[in-house]
């Protein structure tokens, strides 16, 4: 297909169908010259297994589900992001391998994308992240435990009636002048950066907040995991819901924490008793009484520097009461929450998911999960490169890895199988070379230096602005 992924016909990727047990497995596949990293990690066999698991039936045609998924991945990874570019990649791949060339018309490809199940794409994305998490070195984890960062953001999409109905624009915008807006909450691995789950809702309304979306992802977490979050998630009810699942939380304490008192003072953090707050609206009396009347937590003071380089202190609370983990470790762990912000930037800016292209909610969901699948696949390649060079995956630049893969992929595909090993070694070395620095307490002003070019803003819908009697306003 496109130069980003393929090196030969699909039969080449028929493997035993076992899940990737370790990074050594991926490295061994590279050594056998079986092709590019993505095709080795996401094999045709594994895609077909997920399709069968979801009862997806299909015919053998040019745009089969496997071909369509790879084309969709190629599309979200390219700078162009257009369907025409994806179809051109498919045509180039077929021509290079002696197959009949299909029509350049994008209709068949778009129809094939619409036939894909969102559940298939989400399963592939989460499965890739989970396989990577289980394969990572123990030293990459925090005290041997898996840590996940939860955070929220928003994405916009084309202004169509279907999108507006499910994800309406903010009410302050006039009809025809705004764009549908959705809120997303993601669960990211601190060790690998992979995205393990995502929940989406309209930007405003009941049950659309980040805390409500986070509750949908509880089942993704396992007993013994640790969640790192900002002050929004310093919530009595969320803390208890996680505690019941044997999941610890580390969060910044809210400025006005009602109902808590210090019961024990220590250099490693104060032990506080948090009294159950008043019943929230929307919670029944029976549900409210199911929560305990108090919780015991640990509060740690963290030193940080503000934008003026002055030391300021803030409080971090956690359910980790084990004294063998000192307060400094808790504070250092919370400061790494910033890496989740950088991951979201990588997904939205580097992979261009901040403004989606699809015109219906169903296709928007598929586009989002395909972005996350591509993101997790690239994170897996980064983990292999990091393991080869004895560094942590978090030290590898995501954008540098994406640039290296884009540069090397066409050369690896064009090379003979016996000549691919040196190219793959060079790819992994190049990915590991581009690293990010250790930047604790990093602070950047949310402002731009370069001024955008002046352009008048639409004050009425475009189809009205284009009418003859309105043209004089724009020229």
Write out the residue ranges for each language-model feature.
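Noncatalytic carbohydrate-binding groove/subsite architecture in carbohydrate-active enzymes
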Residues: 139
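Extracytoplasmic c-type cytochrome modules immediately beyond a signal peptide or single-pass transmembrane anchor
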Residues: 168
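Extended, structured, electrostatic nucleic-acid-contact surfaces
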Residues: 91-99
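Major-groove recognition helix of helix-turn-helix-like DNA-binding domains
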Residues: 99-118
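Single, function-defining residue in the core of a domain
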Residues: 1-89, 113-116, 123-131, 142-146, ...
């Amino acid at each position: 297909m496109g130069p980003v992924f393929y090196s030969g016909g699909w039969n080449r990727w028929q493997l035993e169908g076992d899940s990737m047990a370790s990074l050594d497995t991926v490295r061994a596949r590279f050594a056998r010259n079986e092709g590019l990293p993505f095709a080795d990690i996401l094999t045709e066999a594994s895609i077909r297994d997920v399709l069968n698991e979801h009862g997806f039936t299909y015919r053998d045609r040019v745009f089969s589900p496997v071909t369509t998924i790879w084309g969709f991945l190629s599309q979200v990874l390219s700078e162009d992001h257009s369907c025409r570019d994806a179809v051109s990649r498919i045509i180039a791949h077929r021509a290079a391998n002696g197959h009949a060339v299909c029509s350049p018309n994008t209709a068949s490809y778009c129809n094939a994308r619409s036939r894909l199940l969102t559940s298939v794409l989400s399963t592939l994305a989460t499965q890739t992240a989970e396989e990577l998490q289980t394969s990572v070195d123990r030293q990459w984890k925090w005290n041997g435990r898996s840590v996940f960062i939860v955070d929220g953001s928003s994405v916009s999409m084309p202004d169509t009636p279907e999108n507006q109905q499910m994800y309406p624009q903010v009410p302050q915008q006039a009809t025809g002048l705004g764009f549908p807006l959705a809120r997303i909450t993601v669960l990211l691995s601190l060790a690998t950066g992979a995205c393990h789950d995502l929940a989406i809702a309209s930007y405003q309304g009941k049950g659309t907040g980040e805390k409500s979306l986070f509750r949908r992802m509880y089942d993704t977490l396992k007993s013994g995991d640790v969640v790192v979050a900002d002050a929004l998630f310093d919530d009595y009810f969320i803390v208890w819901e996680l505690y019941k699942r044997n999941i610890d939380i580390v969060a910044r304490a809210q400025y006005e924490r009602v109902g808590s008192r210090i019961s024990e003072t220590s250099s490693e953090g104060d032990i506080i008793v948090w009294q159950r707050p008043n019943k929230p609206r929307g919670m029944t009396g029976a549900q409210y009484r199911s929560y305990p009347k108090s919780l015991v937590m640990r509060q740690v003071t963290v030193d940080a520097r503000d934008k003026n380089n002055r030391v300021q202190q803030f409080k971090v609370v956690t359910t980790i009461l084990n004294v063998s983990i000192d307060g400094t470790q808790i504070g250092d762990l919370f400061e790494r929450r910033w890496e989740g912000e950088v991951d979201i930037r990588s997904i939205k800016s580097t992979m261009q998911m901040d403004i989606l292209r699809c015109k219906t909610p169903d296709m928007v969901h598929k586009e989002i999960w395909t972005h996350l699948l591509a993101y997790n696949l690239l994170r897996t390649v980064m983990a292999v490169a990091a393991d080869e060079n004895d560094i942590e995956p978090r030290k590898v630049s995501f954008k540098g890895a994406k640039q290296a893969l884009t540069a090397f992929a066409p050369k690896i595909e064009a090379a003979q199988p016996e000549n691919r090993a040196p190219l793959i070694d060079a790819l992994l070395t190049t990915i590991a070379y581009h690293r990010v620095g250790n930047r604790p307490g990093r602070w950047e002003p949310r402002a731009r230096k370069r001024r955008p070019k002046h352009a008048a803003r639409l004050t009425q819908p475009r189809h009205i602005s284009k009418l003859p009697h309105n043209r004089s306003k724009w020229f």
